[in-house]
A protein has these predicted regions:
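The feature marks the mature, well-folded catalytic cores of soluble enzymes
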Residues: 1-273
């Protein structure tokens, strides 16, 4: 079994400095001490389960650099860098590109004019790339990736602005298994998932709003935000070990466990061979 490797960024400059999704409100900002404590707990939980965590250097003025999942898409030693829809996040790209270039990855960019927000909207389940579009990423970017990688890509239209990235409402657990929140997808998208993923564990609406689907999967361990008891029960029935880590300070910005991490060696659910 390969050693799991995950990229994270300490929340030294994290805060609610702008509003680019329905979760964010500058009038209800984050508490730095609580954010640091919650991030540290997630970090320690992952390390305690055998993960090697690589760290980005935080940058002043880039509060969302902490959400490394949006840096880009990793495929073997290729890194497809994100083109963010919002300028306030586009300033993160040079730092992510520099990190990946310095750590042995070939950094690539999608064609100009195509918005693409990385592993936030592009998740492998088996050999298939499931791709969220409309709110942040463009469907054209996923078509491009499918051609370059030689992989089947299944576009999924996101229709609920509170679930603006695919990783907020869909979490592959293993090839053919995933958590999802049906209410984030249109009828066609729900049908696509039901057809192509053998086992789907639906998240209750209240737990979906706790970002229960925004989970980190390491083998049979699934790390979620707190307040997702029914989802945890379903995971245990499937043979997984759910672990709850309070991440409410990051929910204020529309993020949770998965948003705070980027797998560098391929998700356990991904089949790249």
């Amino acid at each position: 079994m390969r050693q799991p490797r995950i990229l994270m960024c300490p929340p030294d400059y994290y805060g609610i400095e702008y509003e680019i999704n329905p979760w964010m409100s500058r009038s209800h900002g984050s508490t730095p001490e609580r954010a640091h404590g919650q991030w540290r707990k997630l970090y320690e939980t992952l390390v305690g389960h055998g993960v090697t965590v690589e760290l980005m250097t935080p940058q002043k003025g880039l509060p969302d650099l902490v959400f490394t999942a949006n840096a880009g898409l990793v495929f073997e030693k290729l890194f497809f860098s994100s083109t963010f829809r919002h300028e306030v996040r586009a300033r993160e790209t040079p730092y992510f590109d520099a990190w990946f270039g310095a750590h042995g990855f070939e950094v690539r960019h999608l064609p100009k004019g195509i918005y693409f927000e990385g592993a936030g909207d592009a998740l492998f389940c088996g050999p298939t790339l499931y791709a969220g579009y409309r709110i942040r990423s463009d469907v054209g970017g996923h078509q491009y990736l499918g051609k370059v990688l030689g992989r089947q890509v299944l576009p999924l239209e996101l229709v609920n602005p509170r679930f603006y990235h695919l990783d907020t409402c869909f979490c592959p657990l293993a090839p053919g298994e995933a958590i999802y929140f049906p209410g984030a997808f249109d009828t066609y998208g729900q049908k696509v998932l039901e057809t192509h993923v053998k086992r789907l564990l639906p998240a209750p609406e209240n737990e979906a709003h706790r970002f229960g689907c925004n989970a980190v999967v390491v083998g049979k361990t699934v790390v979620t935000n707190t307040g997702c008891e029914r989802l945890a029960e379903g995971l245990r029935e499937w043979g997984y070990e759910p672990i709850a880590v309070e991440l409410d300070e990051f929910l204020k910005a529309g993020g949770s466990a998965k948003c705070l991490t980027l797998r560098l060696d391929g998700e356990d659910a991904a089949v790249w061979e």
